[in-house]
C-alpha cells in the first residue's frame, strides 16, 4: 500500500470515528443524536448548492471545503444507516466502486483495443444504467 493510500485510509477512518463519537448515545452531540435521514436532507441540499456556487466561482479552496461538507453528509447518512442495521459506509464505497466498474466496461473489462468516443461512452452508460 502506498503512503498516499495509507494517509487516505487513516483520514477516512478518522472521519468515521468522529461521526461515531458525535452520535454516541452517552457522550455524543445532542443535536447530532436527534438527526435522522429526513432531518439532514435540507443540510445535504444546502451543502450541495454551496459546492455548486464554489465551482461556479472557481474558488478551489472553497470547493475543497464544500467537498468536505458533502463527504460529511455521506458519512452522517452512513452512520445513521449503520445504527439502524441498514448498511455501512463500506457498503456505500463497495457499491459505487462496483457500479463504476460495471458502467465503464471500456476501461475495466477486456477490450479488443478499439478506442471509444465520449458519445459512445455516454450511450453505453445509459444502456447499462437503464
Please state what every model-predicted region is.
Residues 1-66, 72-130:
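Flexible "arm" and connector segments at domain edges
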Amino acid at each position: 500500500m502506498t503512503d498516499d493510500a495509507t494517509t487516505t485510509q487513516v483520514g477516512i477512518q478518522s472521519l468515521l470515528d468522529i461521526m461515531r463519537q458525535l452520535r454516541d448515545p452517552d457522550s455524543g452531540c445532542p443535536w447530532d443524536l436527534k438527526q435522522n435521514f429526513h432531518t439532514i436532507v435540507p443540510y445535504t441540499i444546502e451543502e450541495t448548492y454551496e459546492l455548486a456556487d464554489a465551482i461556479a466561482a472557481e474558488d478551489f479552496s472553497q470547493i475543497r471545503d464544500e467537498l468536505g461538507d458533502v463527504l460529511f453528509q455521506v458519512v452522517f447518512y452512513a452512520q445513521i444507516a449503520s445504527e439502524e442495521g441498514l448498511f455501512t459506509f463500506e457498503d456505500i464505497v463497495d457499491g459505487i466502486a462496483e457500479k463504476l466498474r460495471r458502467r465503464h466496461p471500456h476501461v475495466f473489462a477486456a477490450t479488443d483495443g478499439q478506442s471509444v468516443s465520449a458519445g459512445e461512452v455516454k450511450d453505453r452508460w445509459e444502456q447499462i444504467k437503464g
